[in-house]
A protein has these predicted regions:
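Low-complexity, intrinsically disordered short peptide segments enriched in small/polar/basic residues
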Residues: 1-2, 15, 41
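Bacterial N-terminal signal peptides that target proteins for export
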Residues: 1-9
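C-terminal motif of bacterial Sec signal peptides marking the signal peptidase cleavage site
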Residues: 16-20
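A residue-level marker of the well-folded mature domains of exported/periplasmic proteins
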Residues: 21-370
Length: 370
């Protein structure tokens, strides 16, 4: 998910094209001319979705800029009046979708756009209760935080058996619909309520939990970090970089200098952070959470299988649109391991493909299918 605010004035569009029944170049209007009216959005007028036929118009990225996230939705509404579903793949995307739809008077009894979500923002859960959001796929950020501290503390005490052979501790995602949202929300509120703090414990190890940004998702995770620290009698720090990859780099370098006993990090751009992460791994215990860095020397990844979670989201889209339709995906960025896998899982499930987490649809083709 990533979840911090960074200012980026330009709209970034990564086309996701759905392979299935057919594959083509960029969609055109009825007379074969492409839409170059600006903004980089695809136009698929004159190509109506047939029964059970899904057309993914593209994926709009916002680089974690909330204003841009909303602008992406507004542009989509302006260019695709017959859009059937909007899918928000990071925690703040569904609220941005709902806000834009509300201002466009597209929510309520006559709502024609299905909203499918990721994560458990209050606006998303309330939308499921109200019927303006079909459903969401939720992670378990509280357990991401709790388990990260638990594993680091175990390693500090010499218990290496906490690391599975595949170096992956799975905290499964789940689908939330209207019939389960009340119970889920009640449980969530119970976990994150209160203002517990992790007071300094003299002579005890210190572990750092580094997020990839600032968001309510990470506030939930921080509650798990604090709870585990207090239960296990260790010191914990939660660091949320508000200014992107450079900010996260500075934090990790500072933690290395300080000599903390362990770092749990959600890499912003794992491909380009391998050297930094390996530097940390040489000096302390390094694990990843939420988004992995499989090429780095991390000890274990704690999180969900993002490809599987993406497929779960694709299933929700198919439920919401049994007759097919045009779909737009919204996400922060695609440089992250979790984002790429999540997006691909959505596409594959939406098209009824077999599971293959090594598949990656090219960005220069339009794909559609049933």
């Amino acid at each position: 998910m990533k979840r911090f605010v960074a200012t980026l004035p330009l709209l970034t569009l990564t086309l996701l094209l759905v392979t299935g029944c057919s594959e083509s170049g960029a969609p055109t209007d009825g007379d074969g001319g492409s839409d170059d009216s600006g903004g980089g959005l695809l136009k698929v007028s004159g190509k109506e979705a047939e029964t059970g036929n899904y057309i993914v118009l593209g994926t709009l990225t916002d680089q974690f800029d909330r204003a841009q996230a909303k602008a992406n939705v507004e542009d989509t509404l302006a260019r695709h009046s017959d859009i059937a579903a909007m899918v928000g793949l990071f925690a703040y995307n569904p609220p941005a979708i709902l806000e834009a739809l509300q201002q466009a008077d597209r929510l309520g009894e006559d709502q024609t756009v299905q909203v499918i979500a990721f994560d458990e923002a209050d606006e998303t859960l309330q939308g499921i209760k109200d019927g303006t959001v079909y459903g969401t796929v939720v992670q378990n950020p509280y357990m991401y935080g709790y388990k990260s501290v638990e594993v680091l503390a175990a390693l500090e005490s010499g218990k290496t058996d906490v690391i599975p052979k595949d170096k992956f501790i799975d905290i499964p995602a789940r689908q939330i619909r209207k019939d389960t949202v009340d119970d889920f929300w009640t449980d969530l509120k119970a976990k994150v309520g209160g203002d517990a703090k992790n007071d300094t414990k003299e002579g005890k190890p210190r572990f750092a939990y580094v997020t990839n940004g600032v968001a309510s998702f990470w506030t939930i995770a921080s509650k798990g970090v604090i709870a585990a620290g207090n239960k296990l009698g260790v010191n914990t720090d939660v660091l949320m970089p508000a200014e992107g990859i450079a900010d996260q780099k500075r934090m990790i370098e500072d933690l290395i200098t300080r000599g903390v006993q362990g770092i749990a990090v959600s890499p912003i751009d794992a491909e380009n952070q391998v050297d930094l992460l390996n530097q940390a791994a040489e000096k302390t215990r390094l694990i990843t959470h939420d988004s992995d860095a499989p090429k780095a020397n991390r000890l274990v990844y704690i999180g969900m299988d993002n490809y599987t979670a993406g497929r779960m989201c694709g299933e929700l889209i198919r439920e919401a649109l049994p007759k097919g339709g045009k779909v737009m995906l919204f996400i922060g960025r695609l440089e992250q391991d979790n984002a790429r896998l999540r997006r691909q899982g959505v596409i594959d499930a939406l098209l009824g493909r077999s599971a293959d987490n090594t598949r990656f649809d090219p960005a220069d083709k339009v794909l559609e299918g049933r």
